[in-house]
Amino acid sequence: MSSMWSEYTIGGVKIYFPYKAYPSQLAMMNSILRGLNSKQHCLLESPTGSGKSLALLCSALAWQQSLSGKPADEGVSEKAEVQLSCCCACHSKDFTNNDMNQGTSRHFNYPSTPPSERNGTSSTCQDSPEKTTLAAKLSAKKQASIYRDENDDFQVEKKRIRPLETTQQIRKRHCFGTEVHNLDAKVDSGKTVKLNSPLEKINSFSPQKPPGHCSRCCCSTKQGNSQESSNTIKKDHTGKSKIPKIYFGTRTHKQIAQITRELRRTAYSGVPMTILSSRDHTCVHPEVVGNFNRNEKCMELLDGKNGKSCYFYHGVHKISDQHTLQTFQGMCKAWDIEELVSLGKKLKACPYYTARELIQDADIIFCPYNYLLDAQIRESMDLNLKEQVVILDEAHNIEDCARESASYSVTEVQLRFARDELDSMVNNNIRKKDHEPLRAVCCSLINWLEANAEYLVERDYESACKIWSGNEMLLTLHKMGITTATFPILQGHFSAVLQKEEKISPIYGKEEAREVPVISASTQIMLKGLFMVLDYLFRQNSRFADDYKIAIQQTYSWTNQIDISDKNGLLVLPKNKKRSRQKTAVHVLNFWCLNPAVAFSDINGKVQTIVLTSGTLSPMKSFSSELGVTFTIQLEANHIIKNSQVWVGTIGSGPKGRNLCATFQNTETFEFQDEVGALLLSVCQTVSQGILCFLPSYKLLEKLKERWLSTGLWHNLELVKTVIVEPQGGEKTNFDELLQVYYDAIKYKGEKDGALLVAVCRGKVSEGLDFSDDNARAVITIGIPFPNVKDLQVELKRQYNDHHSKLRGLLPGRQWYEIQAYRALNQALGRCIRHRNDWGALILVDDRFRNNPSRYISGLSKWVRQQIQHHSTFESALESLAEFSKKHQKVLNVSIKDRTNIQDNESTLEVTSLKYSTSPYLLEAASHLSPENFVEDEAKICVQELQCPKIITKNSPLPSSIISRKEKNDPVFLEEAGKAEKIVISRSTSPTFNKQTKRVSWSSFNSLGQYFTGKIPKATPELGSSENSASSPPRFKTEKMESKTVLPFTDKCESSNLTVNTSFGSCPQSETIISSLKIDATLTRKNHSEHPLCSEEALDPDIELSLVSEEDKQSTSNRDFETEAEDESIYFTPELYDPEDTDEEKNDLAETDRGNRLANNSDCILAKDLFEIRTIKEVDSAREVKAEDCIDTKLNGILHIEESKIDDIDGNVKTTWINELELGKTHEIEIKNFKPSPSKNKGMFPGFK
């Protein structure tokens, strides 16, 4: 292994790490390997920013590869060296024209291989060894399809007339899951052929002529490899899998993208992998993408009801194995789901089914962790977790997710729709014996709903409910005829109606095959959910019945009144008539699981090892009892930062001395709301850059916003910072755009000092988003985010825990309730301090923290508990906070340039250039650098050279000037301090987000019991009471880029920064010193007076800044940066930039756009893609430009300034200057015409200017 990796041997397993591991990472890897080697479960907490993901990936993959005895960097090369022959029919030895002329049917199969070898490593095929892969079937099917329009998104399936066959000659064909439509088969007239019987083999076809060239088969994509070769590597003589797969689950798809980026930087980046995702993220079909319910639409297309099927689905075989994906498609390193989607679009192959097919040879499978907990999703994805390793990252919400996975809710409207559809099937004599019992189930539930709707108890305004225990519901189900004995029969009927069949019947003298209709996708989904929860209720002699509560809830919704035609069938509507709305009662039947161990029972006892990790697992004592899993290995790791890097304090009173206790009663008062607003304003004036403020609920957020708008405090906040509010609900794209406005306001701050983002605990902002460096210099939490005590599910859960706390060891209801609050609070606090060199303040506003610390502090994360300080008065807290912020801000302004010579502590891959972005993202570029090399020298600025930098500045002193910060790929430009004036760009007001059933009559139905006559006992089985069941506790089984060294001055407002262009050439490394860079005192004082938001500490006129570029004395592997742009995507920043315009293009644009004025667009938000300055003719030498107000982002950015033209290295600099745009100055400026995007204005409040 190359020396570029740090090597550790833990528990006999050799681990290659991309840098010197932190102590917390070593502790995590040690715990993980102990659990994997001993097949025990792990519960590990490591603070956010401590490198938890890398420790998980490296240790688990190193352990997995140690079982096969191959090094980490040889896994892919071994597979690539295996030469696999094509197994298609056109290459088989026994394929002859005589066979085709005789019209005999042929199997396009792999060479004869024992099933155990062919499918041994697939976790999805361990229980069914004869299962054939989807790619093999589709490849064979592609050969049989001769007339296909390659440019059409659909293929019309051709029907073939076959000779009548005897029963022994019937060729049953396997359907690739319940969602897939296959080619038709012909049998004796009037007979029915099942297309997805479990006993079927792969498809058989009888083409009328030999298949074409290999372009029709998998050889066309150089995919002709059989799965046996890679499988036999991992098989012993018994055919059983020796090496477990790793299922890596996390909370969201965005977090999966972050994990795969981490994997790409390790020695294990070439490991075979796949990412399971929903159709919302992977479907590329144009008809499905625009559909609201993509699952149902996809299933309808695959059914091919209109004679058409999804063409993307039939191209899955092109990229459905790891060898093809890595060797021929160039995805040899860890990839993201977006890359697979792009490849699927290019090759017309469905990414959704491709990802599922890649499971077979994958060593690690990434997915949202509800894919592993939800029984329906596991069945749909065909996941078998037996003897596998399950790692669940960000698992602080795993209890809630497990409860939701075992719960189900269905509306009365859905039940009626399903009943009517099933009734239509019965009336048309379509598989009547199977549809009738299912119809009876729906009818029984509807009648029971209607009968109990009159006895609902009112809880809140326009809401009522009634609750039953699980045992009471079992008695009700038994009266309906649904019992432990009849339920398996119902499951059999349901499986039968999902099978696709064809009926052969003579039409006009010819025999035609017609597909037997099946119930709609929506009815299938509803019945699957209902049968899933009934299965839990009846499982193991109703073991989990006491863990359920069944509730009927009634709410009201406003719907448009239906227009009814007259007796003649005419419908007359007045031209200006407003459609009337009516209030309609909505009934919902809920099956609520109160015990997360129910869902975990499918996993616990089957998997080899479960690893739960998060940065906020505290308090950890509830996981074992709630999940029913014994975590023998537990760890609470320390943070990697120093105590001086974080300020943690509690504040119990506001600026006016009023007590701040955020209980429900207090938050309703104007005094509390005004005091919180004054506190927030003071913190915004004290801490620069980005501030996050988290509130307990959206309801409180709306109250505070309304109050602050009426009192004018909101306006005062907007004078200091750009104020943005997290929207409740809404589209994801709208939220991403709003978040981009927040990042831009910090990155390109103008007259305002950063931004304030007001959000809600448990909302989108508090979970899974990274606010490193300037994006979150302070996190303020108001109150303690307890769940809504009046919520029915919260109330039932508290009662459940109180009832079972002694018998099952569960936490009492009150403790469980408080733990939910602290987990949400810890998640919000975790948005700050995202890497080792980050710093920030955590401000907990509530008097309860100080008055009762033993109760309210114990639930916080360990690293927060260790540093928390209680402040008796607001003044003392603000003074301490100001000192902390000033100290770090001053160090930041001088030391940003020092970060450039620090070893990248998380990436040592060799590259040829550095990429810098502006202030908030400079720190991200050096976010994980080793602190050993950190030099805090305010007099000298060290710039580390990679290869051969050429500094275009000479060693002679420069004139007093302001050298502005620039974006990554933009040229450097220099600006003299006395020749320009500050440009003020105001932000405009942005609007807030604006958000945006059919009842069928039924006559009668027959009892469900008649469908089981003679099959089941009619006596009612004895069901234990809730007390009896409680007494027996259940058993829980490189692209080149210019490098810019940014050297900001020490002024707090960062009104000017120094940018030095560093280009890499072939000359030897050298040292260039910029010395004696002095700032004119008079000019500095003038600049200070022009900045209303500046602190009193102006830039010291005697400070001398020097630029030193030294030879790197460390190995290249210890100082290289990774050039991939994905590290910045978590900030939603642009990753691509437009190329520079030529001189001719600039002149053309100047002539076209002449005459437009920037002042006409001064109300636009300071965001991206607004306008671009091309030429500025006149220069006022008495004014200074504030450079950071006009930073160029050509792709989405604000002002694009004409590049400085540097002609020679002797310092002869020709610069295009920026002029004053205010007060009727006679400057001539040419800008691009533009129209601000409305999406950029969403989420902003009135008065935002």
Swiss-Prot record:
Q: What is the effect of changing S988A?
A: Does not affect the interaction with BRCA1
Motif DEAH box per record, residues: 393-396
Q: Where is this region: Interaction with BRCA1?
A: 888-1063
The record's domain comment reads: 4Fe-4S iron-sulfur-binding is required for helicase activity.
Quaternary structure, from the entry: Interacts with the replication protein A complex (RPA) via the RPA1 subunit; following DNA damage they colocalize in foci in the nucleus. Binds directly to the BRCT domains of BRCA1. Interacts with the CIA complex components CIAO1, CIAO2B and MMS19.
**Listed GO cellular component terms?**
BRCA1-B complex; cytoplasm; nuclear membrane; nucleoplasm; nucleus; replication fork
Phenotype when changing S1001A: Does not affect the interaction with BRCA1
What tissues harbor this protein?
Ubiquitously expressed, with highest levels in testis.
Q: Where is this region: Disordered?
A: 102-131, 1018-1042, 1108-1127
Listed result of changing T1013A? Does not affect the interaction with BRCA1
Q: Which PROSITE patterns match?
A: HELICASE_ATP_BIND_2
UniProt name for this protein: Fanconi anemia group J protein
What does altering P47A do? In BC; early onset; loss of ATPase and helicase activities
Q: Could you tell me where the Polar residues compositional bias lies?
A: 102-127, 1023-1032
Question: What's the record's note on cofactor binding?
Answer: Binds 1 [4Fe-4S] cluster.
User: Could you tell me which species this protein originates from?
Assistant: Homo sapiens
**What keywords are assigned to this protein?**
4Fe-4S, Acetylation, ATP-binding, Cytoplasm, Disease variant, DNA damage, DNA repair, Fanconi anemia, Helicase, Hydrolase, Iron, Iron-sulfur, Isomerase, Metal-binding, Nucleotide-binding, Nucleus, Phosphoprotein
Question: Which residues of the sequence carry a binding annotation for ATP?
Answer: A185, K186, V187, D188, S189, G190, K191, T192
Report the NCBIfam families cross-referenced here.
rad3 (TIGR00604)
Write out the similarity annotation. Answer: Belongs to the DEAD box helicase family. DEAH subfamily.
Listed Basic and acidic residues bias regions: 1110-1122
Q: How is its activity regulated?
A: Helicase activity on forked substrates is stimulated by replication protein A complex heterotrimer (RPA1, RPA2, RPA3). Helicase activity on G-quadruplex DNA is stimulated 3-fold by RPA, and inhibited by MSH2/MSH6. Unwinding of G-quadruplex DNA is inhibited by ATP-gamma-S and telomestatin (TMS); TMA does not inhibit unwinding of forked-duplex DNA. Helicase activity on dsDNA and G-quadruplex DNA is inhibited by porphyrin derivatives meso-tetra (N-methyl-4-pyridyl) porphine tetra tosylate (T4) and N-methyl mesoporphyrin IX (NMM).
For the modification Phosphoserine, the affected residues are: S505, S927, S930, S956, S990, S1004, S1032, S1237
The observed outcome of changing A349P is: In FANCJ; destabilizes iron-sulfur-binding and abolishes helicase activity
Q: Name the source's superkingdom.
A: Eukaryota
Sorted alphabetically, which InterPro entries does this protein's record hold? ATP-dep_Helicase_C, DinG/Rad3-like, Helic_SF1/SF2_ATP-bd_DinG/Rad3, Helicase-like_DEXD_c2, Helicase_ATP-bd, P-loop_NTPase, RAD3-like_helicase_DEAD, Rad3/Chl1-like
Role noted for this protein: DNA-dependent ATPase and 5'-3' DNA helicase required for the maintenance of chromosomal stability. Acts late in the Fanconi anemia pathway, after FANCD2 ubiquitination. Involved in the repair of DNA double-strand breaks by homologous recombination in a manner that depends on its association with BRCA1.
